[in-house]
């Protein structure tokens, strides 16, 4: 496995320079584009990694999975009264569909859906950002995971579109807390800094029927784990989820920080990171690396 990971990084490294680092978040625009890492973690605790897999980066929308899991833990099926679990087919920050569907987001992985989930969690936790940080630390076994306040502040200063989505949902009665407070929590979630190794470990409960070996806790039950993996498979890569299923064939979640996490149910998790994005906002070299790994090992849910 170690040799395979090294080979795959060598094969996809020439793609660096063909994508573009996220620049609509100023604090992310200065990230060095030539970084590339990959980590594989098995449900039995075996870890393999290559490249920049130990270097922390901004997880951005990958955090939406953690938020969703927290909401499922305390509210269960009730959360689906306020949002759906269908693919949107629209850009992750689109307002058009949200207006047409009267403030009910299609799924928890587009921005509007993630904001509803954060609104649900805001009603539950006295300090949502700290609760999320502590939850993630338990999942990955790394007590040094923190949120980058500079990135969070940068995102908050450029919050107009997310604020518009939140206020639109509030006008339809689907947003209950103070919009600015929820946005602050949301951006602190997105600004969490984790490495490929951290994320591969943190997501391993989704490969093990909801059980996290690091914390010894049953994070989700088996049915809930299946549901989260299903939403990742259909909606985890913005409006490129179909292409990702076609090329990689695994449940996954991406972020504009360049990270992608993928789950092989019953076996492994794998995280890749390369900051340069394609036109859909997903890591260009990251998708290529996952495609090669899936083909070489024969990992696919299809």
Curated annotation (Swiss-Prot):
GO terms for molecular function: glutaminase activity. Its EC number is 3.5.1.2. Keywords: Hydrolase. The keyword Hydrolase applies. It is an enzyme of class 3 (hydrolase). Substrate binds at residues 61, 111, 155, 162, 186, 238, 256. It catalyses: L-glutamine + H2O = L-glutamate + NH4(+). GO terms for biological process: glutamate biosynthetic process; glutamine catabolic process. Belongs to the glutaminase family. Homotetramer. This is Glutaminase.
